[in-house]
């Protein structure tokens, strides 16, 4: 699979031969959907919580007598039928949202995403991405010169300078291959991969 090799101005300078096992696979929409949903589900913290009828703070006194009022009988105001009462099936903080994805399925799904991005022209290769100092302004100017506004950069190695220079950039994320995830791949408009990262992606997803 031939990918565009971009220069410093963001223009296609030449072609780069990328491995077909990662960048030339057929697109499997169902598989991609499954790994994206599973990744988002596994990222949930499970911190939401609601109270049932035992946890809400209400008096246990019977609100009115059992018979003779014409109203439906009621035992206490903490009943889920009453306003301010507890929930019947409350959300609990220990709820488990995790979904299991087999390693082969995950690798195949990631390769399908990379391949589809390449076919759509949303994926390109650059020689490298390095900065001399942890300054955001020069790096932002470089991306602006390449006409990139929403981009995921997969670099072979993200050193401290590159991390500090890129972390404040809006709509720009710089990660190492091991931290590339399906949600980020489908979210950003453009994906840049360094030559060294291509080899690592081949080891991970081929």
Swiss-Prot record:
Pfam families: Ribosomal_L4 (PF00573). Residues 58-70 have a biased composition (Basic residues). The keyword Zinc-finger does not apply. Residues 44-77 are annotated as: Disordered. It comes from the Bacteria. Keywords: Ribonucleoprotein, Ribosomal protein, RNA-binding, rRNA-binding. GO terms for cellular component: ribonucleoprotein complex; ribosome. GO terms for biological process: translation. One of its GO terms (molecular function) is rRNA binding. InterPro entries: Ribosomal_uL4, Ribosomal_uL4-like, Ribosomal_uL4_dom_sf. Part of the 50S ribosomal subunit. Belongs to the universal ribosomal protein uL4 family. One of the primary rRNA binding proteins, this protein initially binds near the 5'-end of the 23S rRNA. It is important during the early stages of 50S assembly. It makes multiple contacts with different domains of the 23S rRNA in the assembled 50S subunit and ribosome. Forms part of the polypeptide exit tunnel. This is Large ribosomal subunit protein uL4. It comes from Variovorax paradoxus (strain S110).
């Amino acid at each position: 699979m031939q990918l565009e090799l971009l220069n410093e101005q963001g223009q296609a300078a030449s072609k780069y031969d990328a491995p077909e096992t990662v960048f030339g696979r057929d697109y499997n929409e169902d598989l991609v959907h499954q790994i994206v949903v599973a990744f988002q589900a596994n990222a949930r913290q499970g911190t939401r919580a609601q109270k049932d009828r035992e946890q809400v703070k209400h008096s246990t006194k019977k609100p009115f007598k059992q018979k003779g009022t014409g109203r439906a009988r009621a035992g206490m105001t903490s009943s889920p039928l009453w306003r301010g009462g507890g929930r019947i099936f409350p959300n609990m903080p220990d709820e488990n949202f995790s979904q299991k994805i087999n390693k082969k399925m995950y690798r195949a799904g990631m390769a399908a995403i990379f391949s589809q991005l390449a076919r759509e022209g949303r994926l390109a290769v650059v020689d490298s991405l390095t900065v001399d100092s942890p300054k955001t302004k020069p790096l932002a100017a470089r991306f602006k010169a390449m006409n990139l506004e929403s981009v995921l950069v997969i670099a072979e190695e993200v050193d401290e300078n590159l991390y500090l220079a890129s972390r404040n950039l809006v709509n720009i994320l710089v990660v190492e291959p091991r931290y590339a995830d399906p949600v980020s791949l489908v979210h950003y408009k453009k994906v840049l991969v360094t030559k060294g990262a291509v080899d690592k992606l081949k080891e991970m997803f081929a």
